[in-house]
Amino acid sequence: MAYPDIVKVHFDPNFIYRTDAPVKGKVAIVSGGGSGHEPMHGGFVGFGMLDAACPGEVFTSPTPDQMLEAAKIVNSGEGVLFIVKNYSGDVMNFDMAADMAREEGIRVLNILIDDDVAVKDSLYTQGRRGVGTTVLAEKICGAAAERGYDLEKLANLCRKVNINGRSMGVALTSCTVPSAGKPTFELGEDEMEIGIGIHGEPGRKRMKLKTADEITELLALSIIEDIFYKRTIREWDEGKREWVDIELEDPTLKHGDKVLAFVNSMGGTASIELPIVYRKLHEICEKRGLKIIRNLIGPYITSLEMQGCSITLLKMDDEMIEFWDAPVKTAGLRWGM
């Protein structure tokens, strides 16, 4: 097996988990979703990120029994945080798994990631989709868990990362789910889809191909000019022992903010092209008074062979910067050790 010093594989049900799990005195972090987006999530299991990742079939949510069994194996007694992308199947199944785990005496909190500014509702979601901020939340919260954050403090940090992150993507070609044997959608050779979802969901607008600089400007300005997004989400209240509705509002990006810039390949775009996007993004951020203090560039959330990219901007404070810089050792992301 690849990376035997970092991860183990559990079959029936399927999930990947840390070789040293459970880690004594540490809150465990579990995430997951449909396959086809590698290295997310399995490539981010290891020191400083996830304790376990649960893969579904291609573009299909994992089932509750996967998350339940993963939680049981990685739980050290300090509780488990589920980081959940906002897709209807993921939300439903992670919620069910959390309820099942609580019945077995495991403390579990779920935090939703809903950072895609392209559309409010889509084929797979109610509300905004969870995309690029997911990886950033897994890294930052993973480091905080290693530092000894308790479950409630870790959930609050994850929620803070989510509301401060915004993403948007573009597709130049479709992707082909193996079981379907045909492209998820059709695009002309001279067309692109702005605001595409990671499963090929329709975006904000289809238009003629533009230059890399023009595409970057479309994405970046959509993110930067996104203001006061409010929504109601459901979270577990440990005091009341029930699911409750809470109101969230994303703070607006403003002059002087420090941000992490994440330029991501959708899978079919070569890494040599991504710095072109980053160069223009850096220029736009400078003009808007945003200071890029950290960056991540590469194929971290893919959509099979789709050609395209996405941009994520995360407004950072000192706490997030500290945990972003902290050591990490996973198959898909590592530094500092």
Regions found by a protein language model. Name each.
Residues M1-I29, D318, A326-M337:
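N-terminal amphipathic/basic leader segments beginning at the initiator methionine
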Residues V27-G34, L50-A53, G79-S88, D95-A98, ...:
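Short glycine-rich or small-residue beta-strand-to-loop segments that form or flank ligand, phosphate
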Residues G46-G77:
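Glycine-rich oxoanion-binding loops at beta->alpha junctions
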Residues A53-V58, R102-Y124, G289-K291:
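Short, acidic/small-residue loops that bind anionic groups at enzyme active sites
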Residues V91-G105, Y124, E273-R279:
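Short Gly/Thr/Asp-enriched flexible loops that form oxyanion-binding sites at enzyme active sites
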Residues K120-R128, E138-R204:
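Internal, active-site/partner-interface "lid" segment
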Residues K182-L274:
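Glycine-rich phosphate/diphosphate-binding loops and the adjacent beta-loop-alpha structural elements
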Residues E242-M337:
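C-terminal non-catalytic interaction/assembly regions of soluble proteins
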